[in-house]
From Swiss-Prot:
L-serine binds at residues 230-232, 284, 384. The gene is serS. GO terms for biological process: selenocysteine biosynthetic process; seryl-tRNA aminoacylation. Consists of two distinct domains, a catalytic core and a N-terminal extension that is involved in tRNA binding. Homodimer. The tRNA molecule binds across the dimer. It comes from Streptococcus pyogenes serotype M6 (strain ATCC BAA-946 / MGAS10394). GO terms for cellular component: cytoplasm. Catalyzes the attachment of serine to tRNA(Ser). Is also able to aminoacylate tRNA(Sec) with serine, to form the misacylated tRNA L-seryl-tRNA(Sec), which will be further converted into selenocysteinyl-tRNA(Sec). It catalyses: tRNA(Ser) + L-serine + ATP = L-seryl-tRNA(Ser) + AMP + diphosphate + H(+); tRNA(Sec) + L-serine + ATP = L-seryl-tRNA(Sec) + AMP + diphosphate + H(+). This is Serine--tRNA ligase. ATP binds at residues 261-263, 348-351. GO terms for molecular function: ATP binding; catalytic activity, acting on a protein; serine-tRNA ligase activity; transferase activity. PROSITE patterns: AA_TRNA_LIGASE_II (PS50862). It comes from the Bacteria. Its EC number is 6.1.1.11.
């Protein structure tokens, strides 16, 4: 959530930044007018309360001296009524301000490219060279069926579209991947966490999913619970409402969890395969950092995600998302896109973001600065390290062989009991 004081004192800069994120200046102007009216009413309310206090003292004095206080009482009653009217107006204005400010996206960092959509994203670097196949490549969903490791038909029967069963060496490959990912992140100083897979509405507000993106989630009827769309939500909210010791920062968390997404608005997109599912595993990274260190931590986090792809030998590229393509809470985002041979393109497999103090303000996560003793908002960061199902898809396609088998990447073999290849039955 943005700082209302910042909008008030640096309106033109904030308006220009949010315009690049699709927010109209009229919305911000209306917010500014509401804020000005609110501040005026607060002054009036305080003046009237001071007047009421004086009148109350005068009435008490008159009663002590056995004097008639009828007029003073009438005057005080009018003042009290005026205060109530103003307070009711303030409640209404506060709600209007909240309705606007809670759905405003974060302001982009100055280094973020300005653009409308993914066409304006900027490629930063590439790693690895896509393999030159001398046979016709298969899509991962066909490989999965031929190898008897992915069962889409029964997933649809048991649950519905965009669900599947992993089986045999497919299940072992999925498990090997997330264990490998977690082990690599732990080596880099991340604390492993097993989170709840349901959170409450306050947690969804804290990380920015609520109120704007409720349609993208699965809520449990007649409860305050939501299935997590990402482990970012419980990990970030772990410290919600707390003040941390500045000497402890930065703090690194990692977790593997299922992620549940309704994929609202995705009808017709990626209807086959592992790219877009309602339920998938993802290894998440979350950081809590001091403001002056957060962009250095973003580079480290992105490197941590890249490390997984490099050790798996999967070609990828790093993209800096433009202002029009970034997520709601992000101030800056790097996407990692892995090469998918059957589609002859790169597809997103990780997204690493610095939200600066946007989530921390919503969730009230602060730290006490050891230098001056002041309590300040910290910065939160989050990143995929990686989306496991998409990594399975990338391995199946990049490591496929002409005979229909798939070679298991060397780093995963110790996690799979020494298996080296997945062969057709």
């Amino acid at each position: 959530m943005l700082d209302l004081k910042r909008i008030r004192t640096d309106f033109d800069t904030v308006a220009a930044k949010l315009k690049n994120r699709g927010v109209s200046e009229d919305t911000l102007t209306h917010l500014k007018e509401l804020d000005e009216k609110r501040r005026t009413l607060l002054v009036q309310s305080e003046e009237l309360k001071a007047e009421r206090n004086i009148a109350s003292a005068a009435i008490a004095q008159a009663k002590r001296q056995k004097e008639d206080a009828t007029q003073q009482i009438a005057d005080m009653q009018k003042v009290s009524a005026d205060i109530k009217t103003i307070d009711n107006q303030l409640v209404a204005i506060d709600q209007q301000v909240a309705d606007i400010i809670t759905v405003l996206p974060n302001t982009p960092h100055d280094s973020v490219p300005v653009g409308a959509d993914e066409e304006d994203n900027v490629e930063i670097r590439r790693w690895g060279t896509p393999r030159d196949f001398d046979f016709e490549v298969k899509a991962h969903w066909d490989l999965g069926e031929d190898l008897d490791i992915l069962d889409w038909e029964r997933g649809a029967k048991v649950t519905g579209a965009r669900f599947l069963f992993y089986k045999n060496l497919g299940a072992r490959l999925e498990r090997a991947l997330y264990n490998f990912m977690l082990d690599e992140h732990i080596k880099e100083g991340y604390q492993e966490i097993i989170t709840p897979y349901m959170v409450n509405h306050d947690s969804m507000f804290g990380t920015g999913q609520y109120p704007k993106f409720k349609e993208d989630t699965f809520e449990l009827a007649d409860t305050n619970f939501v299935l997590i769309p990402t482990a970012e939500v419980p990990l970030t909210n772990y410290y919600r409402g707390e003040i941390l010791d500045g000497k402890e920062l930065p703090i690194y968390f990692t977790a593997m969890s299922p992620s549940f997404r309704s994929e609202a608005g995705s009808a017709g997109r990626d209807t086959r395969g592992l790219i877009r599912l309602h339920q998938f595993h993802k290894v998440e990274m979350v950081k809590f950092a001091k403001p002056e260190e957060s962009y250095q931590e973003l580079e480290k986090m992105t490197a941590n995600a890249e490390n997984i792809l490099q050790k798996l030998g999967l070609p990828y590229r790093v993209i800096s998302l433009c202002t029009g393509d970034m997520g709601f809470s992000a101030a800056k985002t790097y996407d990692l896109e892995v090469w998918i041979p059957a589609q002859n393109t790169y597809r997103e497999i990780s997204s690493c973001s610095n939200t600066e103090d946007f989530q921390a303000r919503r969730a009230q996560i602060r730290y006490r600065d050891e230098a001056d003793g002041k309590v300040k908002l910290l910065h939160t960061l989050n990143g995929s390290g990686l989306a496991v199902g998409r990594t399975v898809a990338a391995i199946l396609e990049n490591y496929q062989n002409e005979d229909g088998s798939v070679t298991i990447p060397e780093v995963l073999r110790p996690y799979m009991g020494g298996e080296t290849v997945i062969s057709p039955k």
